[in-house]
């Protein structure tokens, strides 16, 4: 993993940054080895490599995330990596759930919203049009409810964590027009 990190330049994106799964050869390619952040990961972060969650159905491990965050390697962007195979994976039903996991890790509502909106837009050089509600922007909005109360989270390695709050999607607005129905189900805490 260190060899790969050393090749990344400022602005390059390392997604699945907190993965706990091995690669196709069976080697673990985590930025954390034996509880310690790889020096190459911190060096990449310091030179401007973007660290993206990319949760998906197999790429988020609490033990990797907690160690990396504690040792100074915070995520820049939150993405779900949702696709046909990951959408029904335990622990990863939708983007707001991934955002909620990071609130449970100590990030504020403002931080997780920025990591899922304005920061990704900046990474792909699409500000102020994307990730913004400025005049002239497309008017794409995800309306969420902050639900307080005990909630259980699980990662893709079946590590469990308890939280006190989660985000529930309520309505989507695309190009200024409400899209679909207001969400009631299946977005319920299980």
Across the structure, where does each feature detected by a protein language model lie?
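P-loop/Walker A phosphate-binding loop and immediately adjacent motor/lid segment at beta-alpha junctions
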Residues: 30-53, 98-105, 156-178
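His/Asp/Glu-enriched, well-ordered alpha-helical/loop segment
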Residues: 61-146
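Active-site metal-binding loops of divalent metal-dependent hydrolases
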Residues: 19, 56, 82
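Glycine/Thr-rich phosphate-binding loops of Rossmann-like dinucleotide-binding domains
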Residues: 23-24, 88, 152, 182
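C-terminal cap of metal-dependent C-N hydrolases
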Residues: 138-190
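Residue-level marker of alpha-helix boundaries and capping positions
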Residues: 31, 55-56, 89-90
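Histidine/acidic residue-rich metal-binding segments in metalloenzymes
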Residues: 1-51, 59-76
């Amino acid at each position: 993993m260190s060899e790969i990190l050393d090749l990344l330049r400022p602005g390059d994106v390392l997604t699945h940054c907190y993965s706990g799964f091995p690669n196709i050869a069976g080697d673990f390619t985590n930025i954390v080895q034996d509880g310690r952040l790889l020096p190459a990961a911190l060096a990449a972060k310091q030179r401007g490599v973007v660290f993206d969650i990319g949760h998906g159905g197999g790429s988020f491990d609490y033990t990797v995330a907690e160690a990396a965050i504690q040792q100074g390697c915070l995520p820049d962007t939150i993405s779900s990596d949702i696709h046909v195979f990951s959408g029904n994976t335990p622990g990863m039903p939708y983007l707001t759930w991934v955002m909620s996991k990071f609130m449970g890790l100590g990030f504020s509502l403002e931080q997780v919203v920025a990591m899922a909106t304005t920061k990704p837009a900046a990474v792909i050089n699409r500000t102020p049009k994307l990730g913004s509600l400025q005049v002239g922007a497309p008017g794409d909005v995800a309306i969420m409810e902050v639900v307080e109360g005990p909630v259980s989270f699980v990662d893709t390695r079946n590590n469990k964590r308890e939280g006190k709050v989660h985000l529930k999607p309520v309505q989507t607005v695309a190009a200024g027009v409400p899209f679909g129905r207001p969400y009631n189900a299946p977005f319920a805490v299980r």
